[in-house]
Structures are given as C-alpha cells and as structure tokens.
Design a protein with these regions (language model features):
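Structural core segment of the AMP-binding/adenylate-forming
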Residues: 83-151, 262-263, 268, 495
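Gly/Ser/Thr-rich phosphate-binding loop
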Residues: 256-260, 272-346, 360, 369
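Conserved ATP-binding/catalytic segment of the ANL
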Residues: 359, 367-375, 379-439
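Conserved C-terminal "lid"/linker of ANL adenylate-forming enzymes
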Residues: 142, 464-466, 477-478, 500-548
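Conserved pre-ATP/AMP-binding loop-to-beta segment of ANL
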Residues: 19-21, 142, 150-169, 175-176, ...
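AMP-dependent adenylate-forming
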Residues: 10-38, 165-167, 174, 322, ...
Length: 548
C-alpha cells in the first residue's frame, strides 16, 4: 500500500477511511482506561489540530515545539503539524527545573513559531516567555485544551521527500541537545528498513511505553506502526516507571507481538515479577527490540530466565543499534535466531545483528580516518538513505559529523561517535569515544565499570564512571547511587569497600569511590547517564562526595 507514497502524511491520508484500530492509549496504564482511535479517528483529529494551528498562523515550514504529555492529543498534534507542512519539534514537557532548562535550550535553538503544550504547564510557559524576551523570540503558546474544532478545514500541504519533516533533538548525554534535521525521505526509508527487519505479519500488535519525544518512541513506534498498518498500544512512561509490571500486563491483555525497551527496562520488568505470575503470558511476543543504550548480556540472560516460565521465546529478543542522526534503526538481529555474543577482555559484548542493506557501515580509525580490519575496534561510520540531513543551524558541526570521508574514498559518512567492530557480518558496539577511560595505558569502557559497580551490592542502582587528571596519570572515579536518601557512615564504608573490590578485581585498577544518595547522578530525558556532565559536576564539587 505504501510503495507509491512519499511522506508519512500521504500514508495517513491513504488510511484515513479505515476503521481498523490504529492507537490504543491506556490513560492510567491499565486496560480499564483504554481510549481507542481508528485510522479514521487519527486522521480526523489530526485535521482538527491542523485547522486550529493554521488559524493561529502556523504555515508550511513553521517550526512547532510539541511538549504535550503522552496521549492521543500528542499524536493528533504531531500529525496535524505535519499535515500543514510545518515542522514538529518533539520535546519533553517542562515538569521539573532540569526539563525547563532543556526546554529553554531547545526553544532558543530552533526559534519556533508556536509551542503546543498542556495547560498544566502554564506557569512554566510564562517563565519561558520571560526568558526569551531578551533574545527576541516570541513563540505563540497553544494549550491543547483550547483546541477549536470549528476552525476552517485546511488542505494538507504537498511535501517532497527532501523537505524537512521534523527536528529531533538528541538526548544530550555528552553535551547540549542538538537538533537533527529528519526529512520525509529519512522517515519513509527507516520505516522500510524496519519492515525488512520485521517481515510481514497480518496479526502484529505493538506496545510502547517509551517517551514519544525520543527517537525510538517516536519513529520506532508511533510513526512506524502507522506506516506498517498495525495497531499500537501506548502507555505513559510515567505509568511504566511507577509500576513496570503494567508493561507485562498489557502484553498479556492485548496479546502483543512486538514491543521495545532499553536495557534498564528489562531489569525493571524482572524486579516487578513476584512469586505469583500466573496472570502473565508473554508467549505472543515475536519481536522485542532492545536498544537506545548499551545492551548487557547478563541483563538479557536474567530477563530470559525469569520470563521463560511466562512463555517468552528467547529468539524474540532483538538487540539493535541506531541513533537519531540515522533517523533511528541501523542494525538488528535477524528475526527467529538467537543473538550472538563475543567474549572480550572486559566482558561479554552482545551483537547488534546485521546491518540493513540500505546502510553501509564501516569501522574507522577516528584519528587517521582509515578503515580498520574486521574484528578490531574503531569508530562506527554510517552511510545510507536514513542518515539525516544534518544538525539544525550548526553548519560546521554538520560538516564534521555528517560529511566525514574515509581515507582514499569519496563517499561521505556519518561519524557516530560510537566505538565497535564487525565480525561475521554483525555489528558489535563497545562504547562512546568521548567516554572512553584510559588509565595506566588501559582502555576501559565506563559502562562495563558501571555494571560492575551495580553488581557489587543490591543497594546500588546506578553508577557513573569517568577519569580525571591525577599525579602523572589519570584517576578512575566511580560515583554510585544508593537506593537510600540518607546513608550511615558504616553503610558508606561497606558500600565503598564492595565497589572498590569489584572494580579492582575485574579491571585491575583501583577506583576512587564516592557513594551518594539516589537522584544525584545526572541523566538524559531517556534515562542515560550523562557522564561528561557528571564529570563536570564532580570537578566543580557539585556532587555530594563520600567523606574521606
């Protein structure tokens, strides 16, 4: 059906008379609160948003920040903006001060015509507008509750494949958020890539609790399900985080065949299980895409062992690799097979599967720009239709990141900043270049250290590792969060010793250990540890340190 269509708006228009289910939103995270939209409902509500925004002056090419809570309103606003040929800019609502600062940075960067937001954030919107006065940016604030369905209908804009579809801001784990310019062709191409990965399934049902502002939650579920034509069950990430078991209950209730989640969500799901799980059935799952953060073999094995009695098939687990700069998906394990692993010096590395035929992936020495032989670690470079047009208003950075060239070759590549290697046609990701720790001549990946820390004691839930200059060498620093808000001196000492012993035995390097209360370590909006920000805070003595 979609072979001759050029944009996701064309796809929605083609499905606009269908009464098949498109989106099922669980308002409180349970089936009892579901609200269903057919494709016809989705198209109609999107058209209402388009008409309303048009009456407020939004035109083709206008940038519109979408900071709406996860809901069907968000979906209607997203497709309504796209119908106008305008450019949606997904953004987390500014619930807390950290999110308000990020929100301000994004608005300052993209200078939108309008901001669509829930009325519950009116105070934050006022603060934002006051901040923007001095820089002459005056966005129109549009509260979703004020939607006027009486506005004159508009004809959907005609967009070309190369037109800008949306601006996806990166999570900013190693710096300030950057706006990735995703074209309509990028979106359609990545949907086709994922279709090849999944294959046809007339009975497919999806489920996502991921934030709809994140590339995996937006492109990998909301847009993808519309493109492929299967129903998608949605719940707020807040409801998942409050009770991760709701995810498993929804899989059971709706006989879900495809879902997605980062590594940490598998741990959360396992911890949500209890002795009585007879009400849970995961046998319908055929595809479980795991990505968005480093994938740990021990996490996968633990999840598989704990969910096997619930009917989970281990071949459904699909470790994958992607990023906003490539729209989303680059590589993933083939369906129906068990994922591969490789024993490395610092632990087991999980394969992210084969690279899709649409992409070309090369492993390159980041200093010499020369290709590296198979099996050796280097920077991952990507080329293909799904690679985005660049960063919004950052020409120099776009040239550096999106127009890299391998020594002796003419084609341009995307420099991902990720380290990895190829083996037997499969991609293995080992870490980030900026985060690599070099101590006493050894290369150490921080995520491996962080995993060792969390394994050291059940009271530790999150850790961050980085290096700082020492006397003639780099010092390995570990900051670990305990589950408690207050920690006694004796408990401090016990946890510190456990962490130091675990890290030293695994990596041969004795770390400086600092135990802190929960919610101390900075994270991105998608839950990734912000290592460079944590390092900056540590050096500025802004992180509470363990007493000497």
């Amino acid at each position: 059906m979609v072979e001759d269509l050029h944009t996701i708006v064309d796809v929605l228009s083609a499905r606009s008379t269908s009464r098949d289910p498109a989106y099922i939103f669980l308002a409180d995270g349970t089936a009892g609160s579901e609200v269903r939209w057919t494709y016809a409902d989705t198209a109609s509500n999107a058209a209402d948003f388009a008409a309303w925004l048009s009456s407020r002056g939004v035109r083709a090419g206008s940038r519109v920040v979408l900071a709406v809570n996860p809901s069907l309103d968000y979906i209607a606003a997203l497709f309504g903006v796209l119908m106008l040929g305008a450019v949606p800019v997904p953004c987390f609502p500014p619930l807390r001060p950290k999110e308000l600062d990020r929100f301000h940075a994004i608005v300052l960067d993209c200078a939108p015509h309008a901001i669509v937001i829930d009325a519950m954030y009116d105070a934050q919107a006022e603060v934002l507008l006051r901040r923007l006065v001095c820089v002459d940016i005056h966005p129109l604030i549009c509260f979703v509750e004020d939607l006027d369905t009486r506005a004159d209908a508009v004809t959907p804009a005609t967009c070309s494949p190369d037109d800008l579809a949306l601006i996806q801001y990166t999570s900013g784990s190693t710096g300030s958020p950057k706006g990735v310019c995703v074209t309509h062709d990028n979106l359609m191409s990545n949907c086709e890539v994922l279709f090849r990965s999944m294959g046809p399934d007339p009975n497919r049902v999806g489920l996502s609790w991921l934030p709809p502002y994140h590339d995996m939650g937006l492109m990998g579920t909301i847009i993808l399900s519309l493109h492929h034509g299967w129903p998608l069950v949605l719940m707020s990430p807040m409801h998942f985080m409050q009770q991760p078991r709701r995810w498993l209950e929804a899989i059971t209730e709706y006989r879900v065949s495809i879902t997605v989640g980062p590594n940490f969500s598998l741990d959360a799901a396992v911890e949500a299980l209890d002795e009585d799980n007879e009400d849970l059935d995961l046998s319908t799952l055929r595809e479980f895409y795991c990505g968005a953060e480093p994938i740990r073999a021990d996490t996968l094995v633990r999840f598989e062992l704990c969910t096997a009695p619930l009917g989970f098939d281990v071949t459904a687990m699909i470790p994958c690799y992607g990023m906003a700069e490539a729209t989303l998906f680059v590589a993933g394990k083939r369906k129906g097979l068990h994922y591969n692993t490789v024993d490395a010096a610092d632990g087991i590395v999980v394969s992210c599967g084969e690279v899709d035929s649409e992409h070309v992936v090369r492993i390159v020495d980041p200093d010499s720009n020369r290709r590296i032989p198979e099996g050796e670690i280097g920077e991952i470079w990507v080329r293909g239709r799904s690679v985005a047009a660049g960063y919004f208003n950052r020409d120099a950075l776009t040239c550096k990141v999106f127009n890299a060239r391998i020594d002796g070759e003419d084609d341009s590549y995307l420099r991902t900043g990720d380290l990895g290697f190829m083996r037997d046609g499969e991609l293995f990701v080992t870490g980030r270049i900026k985060d690599l720790i070099i101590v006493s001549g050894r290369n150490i990946y921080p995520q491996d250290v962080e995993a060792s820390v969390v394994r050291a004691d059940p009271s530790l839930r999150r850790a961050v590792a980085f290096s700082v200059p020492g006397d003639g060498t780099e010092r390995l620093i570990v900051v670990a969060e305990a589950v408690f808000t207050q920690i006694s001196t004796d408990w401090h000492a016990r946890l510190t010793d456990a962490v130091r012993s675990s890290v030293t035995s695994e990596f041969g390097v004795g770390p400086d250990v600092h135990i802190c209360p929960r919610r101390t370590i900075p994270t991105t909006t998608s839950g990734k540890v912000r290592r460079q920000e944590a390092k900056r805070m540590f050096l500025a003595e802004a992180i509470q340190r363990t007493p000497a």
